[in-house]
Amino acid sequence: MDSQRNLLVIALLFVSFMIWQAWEQDKNPQPQTQQTTQTTTTAAGSAADQGVPASGQGKMITVKTDVLDLTINTRGGDVEQALLPAYPKELGSNEPFQLLETTPQFIYQAQSGLTGRGGPDNPANGPRPLYNVEKEAFVLADGQNELQVPMTYTDAAGNTFTKTFVFKRGDYAVNVNYSVQNAGEKPLEVSTFGQLKQSVNLPPHRDTGSSNFALHTFRGAAYSTPDEKYEKYKFDTIADNENLNVSSKGGWVAMLQQYFATAWIPRNDGTNNFYTANLGNGIVAIGYKAQPVLVQPGQTGAMTSTLWVGPEIQDKMAAVAPHLDLTVDYGWLWFISQPLFKLLKWIHSFVGNWGFSIIIITFIVRGIMYPLTKAQYTSMAKMRMLQPKIQAMRERLGDDKQRQSQEMMALYKAEKVNPLGGCFPLIIQMPIFLALYYMLMGSIELRHAPFALWIHDLSAQDPYYILPILMGVTMFFIQKMSPTTVTDPMQQKIMTFMPVIFTVFFLWFPSGLVLYYIVSNLVTIIQQQLIYRGLEKRGLHSREKKKS
């Protein structure tokens, strides 16, 4: 019997299945409903209820910092385009990655303003405000650490509204400050809002992962409250008018894609309403509306919110808002992926190469797990030593399965052998492999990260398939060096073709993940030889492999 070997095959297949399932769940997550009120509001009703009108024509102004290149529409003050100069669109390209976009093919905008009964963005008060600006281009100059972009609007009643975007050097968090001067004789009720809207369907120029299932990650909306730290909300769910309606203090709303995110973070002590809406024409939205504020006659009111528009850099996002770093979605194994990434990042601070960091972390992980590996091989060796007795027992008892089972368990007990002893270490190792997959797919630091020679992007597949082939070779050597008692011809064929099957399967995996597996296999070969030498001294192993 070679149950441990069969368990290894099952374990590898299970890992592969879990990765595939993770991909499916990331593409199509189930909406979380325990903290939401499901509604079936129409698209027009949703927008009107939230006091968020559609944008109109205005003048476009540009804002450039060292990390952001934005285009803002003076009609409403919405951010309609966002380029990230520090992140190329593709490996080797001089074209910056575009996060926000407003074109006939695709809409992705960050809207904000003031609603409420007296708010200029309230549809009942007419078209959205057309702000005045002192110039059309703003640039963060060398030596300048902060850039302010003020926009002003005065309504028919003489009330003045100022919307100021505040940019800081090296920062993807943009503060949006509001100043409301009440020139009337009655209190003015206003409420800040922030909304992210996006086309559901991706055009070809944005669907970068369409040719590789391993590169698909979650794309959709998300929100956070003190009760629900991080909840996804699928675009298709919003498009079906199953909308979110949550009231909470604090929190944020966001739209996510692989490596990048946008988020609105309200900055107030009151209650915010988080919502989603189907805006029609294949466009969905997630946003917040803050608790109204009364500005007394002759007084000036101040409000603020924060927009994150950029890469998912965990430490920076955590500093902007609680749990915003959870948008780096490591899936259900986040509690393993996060420590692994912190360790990987710490190693990288010394070696300066993410590929070598993966190699080192593989040695560390496998070193920590060596006692489990040794226990696994010892258990498998003991099981092999019992095979003659088990075979004799089966011949003696014939087809009496019940007695076979009883005597086999008695034999295991007498010999102090746990038949599942070789399985537990495999079960423990599987989450490590899956967690590393999540880490590679979700960490912006590994995007376009080179290793050596032909590997220029550890988050992408090997363009020449050399690493998957090397992985298959190492798997073949492990198989050949492992003792076996398999006698069934079908099982023998399956075991023979396992390296080939997994080589084909790994062709489309991120090269960083395949690199981890190669190094892990090499460590297995080394540990295997060390363990076998110890087992030989105990009479539990022979260098002469049994013929099948």
Curated annotation (Swiss-Prot):
Q: List the disulfide bonds.
A: none
Q: Where is this region: Disordered?
A: 28-56
Membrane-spanning residues where?
6-26, 350-370, 424-444, 458-478, 499-519
Membrane topology is: Multi-pass membrane protein
Entry keyword Translocase: no
Q: Which GO terms describe its biological process?
A: protein insertion into membrane; protein transport
Assembly, per entry: Interacts with the Sec translocase complex via SecD. Specifically interacts with transmembrane segments of nascent integral membrane proteins during membrane integration.
HAMAP family noted in UniProt: YidC_type1
The protein in question is named Membrane protein insertase YidC
The organism that produces this protein has a lineage beginning with:
Bacteria, Pseudomonadati, Pseudomonadota, Gammaproteobacteria, Enterobacterales
Task: Name the gene that codes for it.
Answer: yidC
